[in-house]
Amino acid sequence: SLVRMRREGEEDLTLEEKAELCSELELQQKYVDIGSNIIGDLSSLPIVGKIVGTIAAAAMAVTHVASGRLDIEQTLGGCSDVPFDQIKEILEERFNEIDRKLESHSAALEEITKLVEKSISAVEKTRKQMNKRFDEVMRSIQDAKVSPLVSKINNFARYFDTEKERIRGLKLSDYILKLEEPNGILLHFKESRTPRDDSLQAPLFSIIQERYAVPKSIDDELAFKVLYALLYGTQTYVSVMFFLLEQYSFLANHYYEKGDLEKYDEYFNSLNNVFLDFKSSLVGTGTSNNEGLLDRVLQVLVTVKNSEFLGLEKNGVNEMLNEKINLFNKIKVEIEGKQRMTLSETPENFAQISFDKDITTPIGDWRDGREVRYAVQYASETLFSKISHWSDPVGVREKACPTLRMPVDQTRRNILVFRKFDSSKPQLVGEITPYQSNFIDIDRDLYNTANNPDSAVGFKEFTKLNYDGANIRATFEQGRTVFHAAAKSGNSRIMIGLTFLVKSNELNQPDKKGYTPIHVAADSGNAGIVNLLIQRGVSINSKTYNFLQTPLHLAAQRGFVTTFQRLMESPEININERDKDGFTPLHYAVRGGERILEAFINQIRIDLNAKSNKGLTPFHLAIIKDDWPVASTLLGSKKVDVNAVDENNMTALHYAAILGYLETTKQLINLKEINADVVSSPGLLSALHYAILYKHDDVASFLLRSSNVNVNLKALGGITPLHLAVIQGRTQILSLMFDIGVNIEQQTDEKYTPLHLAAMSKYPELIQILLDQGSNFEAKTNSGATPLHLATFKGKSKAALILLNNEVNWRDTDENGQMPIHGAAMNGLLDVAQAIISIDATVLDIKDKNSDTPLNLAAQKSHIDVIKYFIDQGADINTRNKTGHAPLLAFSKKGNLDMVKYLFDKNANVYIADNDGINFFYYAVRNGHLNIVKYAMSEKDKFEWSNIDNNRRDECPKEECAISHFAVCDAVQFDKIEIVKYFVTTLGNFAICGPLHQAARYGHLDIEKYLVEEEDLNVDGSKPDTPLCYASENGHLAVVQYLVSNGAKVNHDCGNGMTAIDKAITKNHLQVVQFLAANGVDFRRKNKLGATPFLTAVSENAFDIAEYLIRENRQDIDINEQNVDKETALHLAVYYKNLQMIKLLVKYGIDMTIRNAYDKTALDIATDLKNSNIVEYLKTKSGKFRREYKSSYGEHSLLQTNKISSFIDGKNIEHDHPQFINADNESSQLFSDTASNIDVIGPLLLIDVLIRYFSKQGYISKESDSASDGITQAAALSITEKFEDVLNSLHNESAKEQVDLAEVHGKVYAALKSGRNSQIHPILCSSLKSISTLKPEDMEKLGSVIMNSHS
């Protein structure tokens, strides 16, 4: 790594090298993000020049140390320099970029710019997140076919990112030159969409066409990596388009502002062509044979998402796929929704020019002898055309302000009109509306007069033009009017005239950036105009759109004292108004200088300690600006809090220390109110910490000598200034600390001493300095590490040798049981290893707590020289750690043939295996290292693959299997087709491991095709269970389709009478089932349990498959079919307690009364299983309850029906009714013969009467409850049945669904059984209450009808 390759002690790293160094420590992206995000946070900071980058860097540097503690290892890696230096550089570039973007956009380009910035933000955000991971993908892909394609994607993406960043921070002139280079980056990126070999499009389409990005199984690591590369490349492709649009838009706008309309047209045209070309590539042309890249990538994503082998919800792949599908769909919609970037038609210049107005020259730009030309541009909503050619020149002679006559545009577009005198810069002079044919060129001249610095001439011309009809409300660049122009020039006579021509509210008219005339006047220092506008009642506190600045902010920033005074005369002025970032006008006044500050300080309402959103006060800014006169002016108020802290708890002194301002630091320290030991939050860093951290030795030395500075103050993690001085290699500061008696054994919270830090640092010379001061070289950290440990484990060879020369203890062990020799081995420090072994050779085979010897650690890291040295010194070549890993296994896994040969020659045990039984040969096979496989096969005197391998006996339980068996199995399982081919041709025996079956099991279609098509293997194999059985069981649809299309028998027995479809059903592979169903499966075939595929689906709880089979009615499936035990699907669903399946079967009409071989219905089984939910559901859906009780109690126990009339005639209902209501156990008797002949019906009106009657006659004997249980059940059933008849008569399905009949029956039975007969009436009535819509008189009629119908 770079950390190890860099010469120790070398300090002059470039910024790029530092960035690379810290990238290894995973810091780089954080700093880049800080640099980007700070722009928004401090966008309106009232400080200019490079100081902006400096303050931003200083403010955000606290992030480097605030995430919990100052990361010692990151800082020691040199990264402490990166936050400050790099953030400043990033910010300077970003501010250059912002300066370019703040230039006014032409109206034609504003919408394009918005679209590009919006879209590129979404794409680039996720692309940056993928960037680092893509490096890992690149390193791990070694496939000969795929690697070149992925490498092309990587090379292009890196070039794109590098060039984009390289031009980003250029100054305007350099930026333009770079973009306009012949055959430069714009041309190269445009060609990225062509099929050229070095383009980006070529590898992307190759990956898609060859299906390299479609995994064949969950273990298809290569395909998943290629998929990642495809997504990364596609997002890069989209980013390239938006980058090009951004640059061509910028160039067009640049030349528009310069007035070079020919160049404007050229880049405007390029802008549209780029969009249309990329649009065609990305979303196609709309024809079926021309799909765009996005559609093809989306198809790949959907294919992967729908792969049945993916346990998507469990491994996070599903979330990633959905995110990318949504992103690409969003981009596609965005691009498709934009037909083109510009109007395709370039307008013809039909202008006929005549001087009809009596306006004589000279006036404004109109001077005799000049020539004037006009050009036009179409504008339609957000689309604009190119600008037309210039009209023929017309000489100016005595008259000005001509009339242009143009035909009305038939498509009703507006027309922008441009004017150019001689070779001067063109100007937009107006806009012609769709129905307007005449245009008088006068409004722009009125606007220009207001800008005339000669106020007398300007006013005279203004009066003339206004009199001749010029429009004072006409708008020009950035939406500015004549009011803005007069405010900027300070022409008070014109402004006075304007105030009499319009209402006061029009004087508040903002331009496109929110600047009103009073903003412009304040920013220009035109106090008289400000005063005039205030008198006319304009809004004094109005704010600009972007930064929310008031006129007072602008005047303060410019230092315009008189303008400030005029503004302050308004009683409505808010002197403490905040801008977007919370800065008040006083903050801005820091830039304006001492005079404007004094004016502010004298105001009663001023808040001298006002804080911005980030907590910065004006005093902070003065110190950051290193402007002591301004700071002194603020201090003169006697009200400034010199210890005020920002959001990171940083004072002005912190910033002075960070920025290295020695004289300002001295001034601050001399203030009696200063607290020099305030610490930042949460890093707890003092000003002294920061001075050392940022290597300002003069400031640090001054603070160390200051009496009111605590030199031993601890930051978060227990880091003192001494620790930082060591980390940063500040020898001068260390000497001073030694002189003033600082304790050199100070420890951090993790017990790092200065010597520990020196041993890890890039300043090894500090080690001897500390040792000379008496530092304890045997001190240990919390993890048990000595300085020598840290030197070796951090790869610091020079530091380790210095310590060894001072006779430190080389046998100390840390918490992992490791000695310094282990660290030297792990980091390839040959010289250190030699030095230790020369002192003590016994450490050669010392094992740590993981049983790793130095040799094993060196092998794991591939440090060849160290390995050979250890072996030459007699190290155990067959050493194994706790997981069984040995040197030979490590190199075979990595594919290092030379080292495998070396270890063979050194008589390593070639049959040594890890704890999983994997030897070097299996590792070579599994990782596709054919060269090692061939070498091993050639070394027959050392390695014989026909030997029995008992290390993997559990994988081959029925017999002893040879290495060859496991090797073939591994080659197939891990989809190493080249090794499979080698084995097959070498062995000439297809029986070993059954490669055809194994390929089907793991879904490796290419291997399957090779064996069938090139080796002529029978698709049904030679075993009872066919390859189709394996493929179906494991859900490999593509393999299933291939086998069937090549004649595989779909009804072949897979064992136990099961076929391929049964296998697919058992694992719930719906797509496989659907395919097999369409290709001749016998659905009537039964397995050994007598179950058809349908019954198997139910018993396996494969709901989707069961529903599919029923819905599709495959081969007239009988939903009531029974297995050998006469059980239906309903029985099976009840056994498995699958209520969802039960509801499905009931929905499709299964017979719930069928009894199995044990005379049980499904309801009986549910009852036996005591599953109340299923019992209640089946009871509710079983229709007439009578069927249930016939089987339980026999026909005799049911109530016999008869006509109601005999009962009605024989009883006085009205007379008996009160007694019925109170009837209970006391008056109950056995059910009489008379009652047994009553027809118990359930009309709504008679429910009450019937229940009273039953109550009076009695159902239950007081003498014997158990003896009457059958009768009670029958009575409850009869009542419930008649109640159900009532519900059925309503012809209201929703009403019937609201009543749970099983619940009603249960409650009625309970009431009867307990003798609470009077409760039956409210039970039934409460069930009816929610659905009854009949009034009492309607119920009486209904009862009468029903009674008559039963008579």
From Swiss-Prot:
<comment type="function">
    <text>Presynaptic neurotoxin that causes massive release of neurotransmitters from vertebrate (but not invertebrate) nerve terminals and endocrine cells via a complex mechanism involving activation of receptor(s) and toxin insertion into the plasma membrane with subsequent pore formation. Binds to neurexin-1-alpha (NRXN1) in a calcium dependent manner, adhesion G protein-coupled receptor L1 (ADGRL1, also termed latrophilin-1 and calcium-independent receptor of latrotoxin (CIRL)), and receptor-type tyrosine-protein phosphatase S (PTPRS), also termed PTP sigma.</text>
</comment>
<feature type="repeat" description="ANK 14">
    <location>
        <begin position="883"/>
        <end position="912"/>
    </location>
</feature>
<feature type="repeat" description="ANK 17">
    <location>
        <begin position="992"/>
        <end position="1019"/>
    </location>
</feature>
<keyword id="KW-0040">ANK repeat</keyword>
<dbReference type="GO" id="GO:0005576">
    <property type="term" value="C:extracellular region"/>
</dbReference>
<feature type="region of interest" description="Furin-like endopeptidase recognition region">
    <location>
        <begin position="1184"/>
        <end position="1187"/>
    </location>
</feature>
<keyword id="KW-0638">Presynaptic neurotoxin</keyword>
<feature type="region of interest" description="Helix H8 is the probable transmembrane region of the tetrameric pore inserted in the target cell membrane">
    <location>
        <begin position="226"/>
        <end position="245"/>
    </location>
</feature>
<feature type="repeat" description="ANK 5">
    <location>
        <begin position="581"/>
        <end position="610"/>
    </location>
</feature>
<keyword id="KW-0812">Transmembrane</keyword>
<dbReference type="InterPro" id="IPR002110">
    <property type="entry name" value="Ankyrin_rpt"/>
</dbReference>
<dbReference type="GO" id="GO:0016020">
    <property type="term" value="C:membrane"/>
</dbReference>
<feature type="repeat" description="ANK 11">
    <location>
        <begin position="783"/>
        <end position="812"/>
    </location>
</feature>
<feature type="repeat" description="ANK 10">
    <location>
        <begin position="750"/>
        <end position="779"/>
    </location>
</feature>
<dbReference type="InterPro" id="IPR036770">
    <property type="entry name" value="Ankyrin_rpt-contain_sf"/>
</dbReference>
<feature type="repeat" description="ANK 9">
    <location>
        <begin position="717"/>
        <end position="746"/>
    </location>
</feature>
<comment type="subunit">
    <text>Homotetramer in membranes.</text>
</comment>
<feature type="repeat" description="ANK 3">
    <location>
        <begin position="513"/>
        <end position="542"/>
    </location>
</feature>
<dbReference type="Pfam" id="PF12796">
    <property type="entry name" value="Ank_2"/>
</dbReference>
<feature type="repeat" description="ANK 12">
    <location>
        <begin position="816"/>
        <end position="846"/>
    </location>
</feature>
<feature type="repeat" description="ANK 8">
    <location>
        <begin position="683"/>
        <end position="711"/>
    </location>
</feature>
<keyword id="KW-1052">Target cell membrane</keyword>
<feature type="disulfide bond">
    <location>
        <begin position="401"/>
        <end position="1054"/>
    </location>
</feature>
<keyword id="KW-0677">Repeat</keyword>
<feature type="region of interest" description="Furin-like endopeptidase recognition region">
    <location>
        <begin position="4"/>
        <end position="7"/>
    </location>
</feature>
<dbReference type="Pfam" id="PF13637">
    <property type="entry name" value="Ank_4"/>
</dbReference>
<keyword id="KW-0268">Exocytosis</keyword>
<feature type="repeat" description="ANK 15">
    <location>
        <begin position="916"/>
        <end position="945"/>
    </location>
</feature>
<feature type="repeat" description="ANK 4">
    <location>
        <begin position="547"/>
        <end position="577"/>
    </location>
</feature>
<feature type="propeptide">
    <location>
        <begin position="1188"/>
        <end position="1351"/>
    </location>
</feature>
<dbReference type="GO" id="GO:0044218">
    <property type="term" value="C:other organism cell membrane"/>
</dbReference>
<keyword id="KW-0964">Secreted</keyword>
<feature type="repeat" description="ANK 16">
    <location>
        <begin position="959"/>
        <end position="991"/>
    </location>
</feature>
<feature type="signal peptide">
    <location>
        <begin position="1"/>
        <end position="7"/>
    </location>
</feature>
<feature type="repeat" description="ANK 7">
    <location>
        <begin position="648"/>
        <end position="678"/>
    </location>
</feature>
<comment type="similarity">
    <text>Belongs to the cationic peptide 01 (latrotoxin) family. 03 (alpha-latrotoxin) subfamily.</text>
</comment>
<feature type="repeat" description="ANK 20">
    <location>
        <begin position="1089"/>
        <end position="1119"/>
    </location>
</feature>
<feature type="repeat" description="ANK 2">
    <location>
        <begin position="478"/>
        <end position="509"/>
    </location>
</feature>
<keyword id="KW-0472">Membrane</keyword>
<feature type="repeat" description="ANK 18">
    <location>
        <begin position="1023"/>
        <end position="1052"/>
    </location>
</feature>
<keyword id="KW-0165">Cleavage on pair of basic residues</keyword>
<keyword id="KW-0528">Neurotoxin</keyword>
